[in-house]
C-alpha cells in the first residue's frame, strides 16, 4: 500500500489535509472529510495515534512524583513524531513512523 501511495501525484488540497493530520485534535478533520484518499487516510491514522498519545500524557500528570517526568518525555515524543509526520507530508512521502505506524495499522 505504501508504494502505491508514494507513486501518486498530490494536489494542494491533499497536502493540506495530510498536514492537518499531525496538528493535534485537527487530525479528525482529514479522518472525517477525506477518508477516500489513501495518502490522507494514512497520515490521519498516524496523526490520530500521536494525538491519543498526547491525551494519555496529560493523564500522567495525575501520577505522583513520576507524572511530570512521564508527561515531559511523552510531550517531547509527541512533538518529534508530529514534526516527522509534517516533514513526510511536505516531501510527499508516506513514512511509517516507528511504533506509531504499528498502532495506526491496527486501527
UniProtKB/Swiss-Prot annotation:
Keywords: Biomineralization, Magnetosome, Membrane, Transmembrane, Transmembrane helix
Transmembrane helix is among the record's keywords: yes
Assigned GO CC terms: magnetosome membrane
Regulation of protein activity: Its function may be negatively regulated by one of the MamGFDC proteins.
Family (UniProt): Belongs to the magnetosome MamF/MmsF protein family.
Topological domains annotated Cytoplasmic: 1-13, 68-69
Official protein name in the record: Magnetosome protein MmsF
Transmembrane segments: 14-34, 47-67, 70-90
Reported uses of this protein in biotechnology and industry: May be useful for the manufacture of precision magnetite nanoparticles of uniform mineral type, and consistent morphology, with high magnetization. Addition to an Fe(2+) and Fe(3+) sulfate solution increases the quality of the magnetite crystals.
Effect of inactivating the gene: Single non-polar gene mutation and deletion of the probable mms6 operon (amb0955, mms6 and mmsF) leads to weak magnetic response and much smaller, elongated magnetite crystals. Vesicles that are probably empty precursor magnetosomes are present and can grow to wild-type size.
Membrane topology: Multi-pass membrane protein
Note: This bacteria makes up to 20 cubo-octahedral magnetosomes of about 45 nm in diameter which contain membrane-bound crystals of magnetite (Fe(3)O(4)).
Lumenal side: 35-46, 91-107
Function: Plays a major role in synthesis of cubooctahedral magnetite crystals by controlling crystal growth and morphology after nucleation. Has a partially redundant function with MamF. When overexpressed in E.coli the soluble protein self assembles into shells of about 36 nm. This protein mediates the formation of magnetite nanoparticles from a solution of Fe(2+) and Fe(3+) sulfate; the crystals are larger and lack alternative iron oxide/oxyhydroxide species seen in the protein's absence.
Keyword presence, RNA-binding: no
Subunit structure comment from the entry: May oligomerize.
Subcellular location field: Magnetosome membrane
Amino acid at each position: 500500500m505504501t508504494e502505491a501511495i508514494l507513486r501518486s501525484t498530490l494536489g494542494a488540497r491533499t497536502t493540506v489535509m495530510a498536514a492537518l493530520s499531525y496538528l493535534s485534535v485537527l487530525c479528525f478533520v482529514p479522518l472525517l472529510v477525506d477518508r477516500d484518499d489513501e495518502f490522507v487516510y494514512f497520515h490521519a491514522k498516524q496523526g490520530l495515534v500521536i494525538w491519543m498519545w498526547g491525551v494519555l500524557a496529560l493523564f500522567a500528570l495525575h501520577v505522583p512524583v513520576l507524572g511530570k517526568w512521564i508527561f515531559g518525555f511523552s510531550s517531547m515524543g509527541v512533538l518529534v513524531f508530529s514534526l516527522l509526520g509534517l516533514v513526510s507530508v511536505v516531501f510527499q512521502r508516506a513514512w511509517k513512523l516507528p511504533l506509531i505506524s504499528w498502532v495506526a495499522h491496527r486501527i
